[in-house]
Amino acid sequence: MTCSDSSWTVGGGNDWCTITKVSNTSAKVSVKANTSDFRSTGVVCVNGSNVATISVTQEVLLDRSKLVTAYKQITNSSCAATCAAMCVNKSPETLKNDGIDLEYAMWSTIATKYGYKSTGPDSTSLKSIYNTLKSGYPVIVQVNTGSMEHWVVVTKYSGNSTTLSADDFTCIDPWDAKTKVLSSSTRYSAPNKAVVFKKS
């Protein structure tokens, strides 16, 4: 895109970079890139004595949703096992038929049975979840504490790479098998524990 007036012009823009004129003295440059990409943004002043104020926002897109299959839990207390089922791409019914007790989070048993390795549950944070997504894996996250605990699978992050917000993470909630913002997941208060499944 290009915007201009009689004094100066802001030009540029493609699928990863958007340059927007804010006023006669400022412009906003937004950059979005996958974690494997490197982007650099610069400002060039041609035939002018003054350079406008430029603010640059670095955004990152991490998407691991293709590694999991969404499923709805088949009992009120099988959210954790259903999250594990999503990460090994098996239905909860398949796990049950294979002798897995869905009422308990048998992480290592489920992982080993279907050719995966599991780590956790370990204490977690938004930064830790972000780093795991960046490493290439979805994250099973306990979103609260107490007797009514609930687990979801975090699959995606899209936002600023330095200021993390639960509003910028996307998860699959086994309560209804819907994709939603992490902060809107069932019983969400804050990330508490995390489990990661990796293909053996």
Question: Can you annotate each of these PLM segments?
Answer:
Residues 54-60:
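Interdomain boundary/hinge segments at the C-termini of tandem beta-sandwich modules
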Residues 62, 83-200:
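Conserved active-site-adjacent core of cysteine acyl-enzyme catalytic domains
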